[in-house]
Amino acid sequence: FFGDFGNISSAAAITGNPK
């Protein structure tokens, strides 16, 4: 996924974080 955190990249995408 395209996450800026890497660790919670997938989680961020689910929460609505396009980082």
Swiss-Prot record:
What stretches pass through the bilayer?
none
Tissue/organ expression: Red blood cells.
Q: Which GO molecular-function terms appear in the entry?
A: metal ion binding; oxygen carrier activity
- Annotated keywords: Heme, Iron, Metal-binding, Oxygen transport, Transport
Presence of keyword Membrane: no
Q: What does this protein do?
A: Involved in oxygen transport from the lung to the various peripheral tissues.
Q: Which family does it belong to?
A: Belongs to the globin family.
Report quaternary structure and partners: Heterotetramer of two alpha chains and two beta chains.
Instruction: State what protein this is by name.
Output: Hemoglobin subunit beta-2
